[in-house]
Amino acid sequence: MFAVAVAALALTFSAGVASAGAEGATSPYASQAKQAGLTASQTSALQNEVDRYLAQMGGKQVAANVIDLGGKNLMFVALPGEAHPRDMTKGALVDHCWPGVTDGYFCAYAGGNFTGTSIPMYNCARYRIPWTANGSWINNQTIGTVANFLDDSGVSRWHDGGAYSDDADAPWYWVHWVKNC
């Protein structure tokens, strides 16, 4: 289901880019950003942020502010200076971290107080955390499900008390991975 939604979205935006002509020449998603009300400088800033995450984490850009992280989850990139990622896919891809956290998910945020770029985690797996400053997280998985925070060697150095739990001011500097179960 996840792969089908991402593939359908990619086809939709590819068709839109092909018809955008010179307008979309600067970025495959420039027309999508324009439709979302972004200025040219905001579009450029957002693309720079997406490019930085792609270089750091890999994956594939599937919308103006969405990165597919190897088929197991998505990253929703907030426009620099904005509290939450915008829905630029008209609901085609759901950010389970905003507004509120969907039941069953662990969400990691780049900023404190559950703001900024978000990584929703559903399937039991190890998820890369790209941030080094303080951010935040919410564990809204099945009651009692414990999330483990792993260092650069993949060793669990801390775990939460189980769902539901959260931290509005979490230090990411030592966390390289979260195993959400």
Region spans (language model):
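N-terminal prepro-regions of secreted/extracellular proteins
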Residues: 1-97
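Mature secreted bioactive peptide module from preproproteins
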Residues: 89-181
